[in-house]
């Protein structure tokens, strides 16, 4: 089970040897090269991008544009596609809902969503439906966690205008059949939105191969700072949509009566840019490019398999969709008859950090007939020590609650 160990690249984990961080699906830790790049920006280059002709403002703007190009190359976006920088994956999805869907959808139209979507990929569409009279159709996974393509063929039909789902399920790590769903949607002329947030650290999705119309992700789940998200879409599609935020930086000309907006992608980037976060994304991409991706994925898979084997030996524990056809580095579980927050609290006292709650996926929790669960998620810095620590801590939970 030996593989590349990148733990030495992460200062927080080095300074806190007792920490067993198994919450990377919530946010990854930041490697030293990212932190150093951000510090260099703040101490040598800090300026308000696009707000001045002096060196610092110009250099900051160049850093953003260079990161835009690097991001497009990283996800293999077609030359016809633009990269819009947002503050988060949530904002990216809201731009699509407000600027694409709201002006186009009408009563009788349908939006097809996976029940396993994050709230950020549900709530904006509910708003669109309230405003337009459109309705939502849901795709449900089978007992093992796999979306049924035959069911999707029935749900995705002539009245479908948008199909939106996660590449990797936030709560369970199950991998959705993105290419098949995209093909079904395009057969009926529907637009496809893919939330790639959970996929980015497990092998970068190839947007050109996916063929989707909109692809979104957040930087902080792939080693960058909080505060930067990405929206990738065809330039012509973005040009056909109105702006989302209005103000400085997204206009070419303003009079007392009217404004002339910049073209895409800049018309979606109103307000002062979070240049430091964008710089961190550039550094994170370069860090990801330096990794032995196949070895990293194999290592994470081995850790995941080792943990699952241990969890399945505990009679007082249940897992959710852990036997999906394909799953990437996330295991959802509960100690029977114990609230997930209580379990996570005790694990935390043992130095094991997992997420508990509904994982911003309440409809999915309802579908699973649970209120909440714990979620352990792996990344490149995890080792068998983390698996063993979680296993020991779960035995402690079992003793405390006298589980049999």
UniProtKB/Swiss-Prot annotation:
Q: GO terms for biological process?
A: cysteine metabolic process
Q: Name the UniProt key words of this record, in alphabetical order.
A: Pyridoxal phosphate, Transferase
Pfam families linked to this entry: Aminotran_5 (PF00266)
Transferase recorded as keyword: yes
Reaction(s) this enzyme catalyzes, per UniProt: (sulfur carrier)-H + L-cysteine = (sulfur carrier)-SH + L-alanine
Identify residues that carry N6-(pyridoxal phosphate)lysine: 221
Name of the protein: Probable cysteine desulfurase
What organism does this protein naturally occur in?
Treponema pallidum (strain Nichols)
Q: Which gene encodes it?
A: csd
């Amino acid at each position: 089970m030996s593989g590349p160990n990148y733990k030495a690249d992460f200062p927080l984990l080095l300074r806190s040897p007792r920490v067993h961080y198994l919450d990377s699906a919530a946010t990854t830790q930041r490697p030293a090269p990212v932190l150093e790049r951000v510090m260099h920006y703040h101490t040598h280059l800090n300026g308000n991008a696009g707000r001045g002709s002096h060196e610092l403002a110009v250099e900051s703007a160049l850093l953003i544009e260079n990161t835009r190009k690097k991001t497009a190359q990283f996800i293999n976006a077609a030359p016809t596609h633009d990269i819009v920088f947002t503050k988060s994956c949530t904002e990216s999805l809201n731009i699509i809902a407000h600027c694409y869907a709201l002006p186009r959808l009408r009563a009788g139209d349908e939006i097809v969503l996976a029940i396993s979507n994050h709230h950020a990929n549900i709530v904006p569409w509910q708003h669109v439906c309230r405003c337009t009279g459109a309705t939502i159709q849901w795709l449900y996974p089978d007992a093992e966690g796999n979306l049924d393509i035959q069911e999707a063929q029935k749900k995705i039909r002539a009245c479908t205008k948008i199909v939106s789902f996660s590449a990797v399920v936030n709560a369970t790590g199950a991998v959705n059949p993105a290419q098949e769903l995209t093909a079904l949607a395009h057969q009926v002329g529907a637009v496809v939105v893919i939330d790639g947030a959970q996929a980015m650290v497990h092998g970068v999705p190839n947007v050109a191969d996916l063929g989707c119309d909109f692809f979104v992700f957040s930087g902080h789940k792939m080693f960058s700072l909080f505060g930067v998200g990405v929206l990738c879409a065809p330039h012509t599609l973005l040009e056909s949509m109105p702006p989302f935020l209005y103000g400085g930086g997204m206009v070419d000309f303003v009079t007392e009566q009217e404004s002339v907006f910049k073209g895409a992608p800049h018309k979606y980037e109103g307000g002062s840019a979070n240049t430091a976060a964008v710089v961190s994304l550039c550094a994170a991409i370069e860090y990801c490019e330096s990794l032995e991706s196949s070895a990293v994925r194999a290592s994470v898979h081995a850790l995941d398999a080792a943990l699952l084997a241990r969890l399945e030996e505990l009679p007082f524990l249940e897992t959710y969709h852990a036997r999906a056809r394909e799953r990437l580095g996330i295991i959802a579980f509960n100690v029977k008859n114990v609230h997930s927050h209580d379990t996570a609290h005790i694990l935390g006292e043992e130095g094991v950090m997992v997420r508990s709650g509904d994982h911003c996926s309440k409809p999915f929790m309802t579908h699973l007939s649970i209120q909440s669960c714990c979620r352990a998620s792996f990344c490149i810095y995890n080792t068998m020590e983390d698996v063993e620590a979680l296993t020991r801590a779960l035995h402690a939970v079992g003793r405390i609650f006298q589980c049999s």
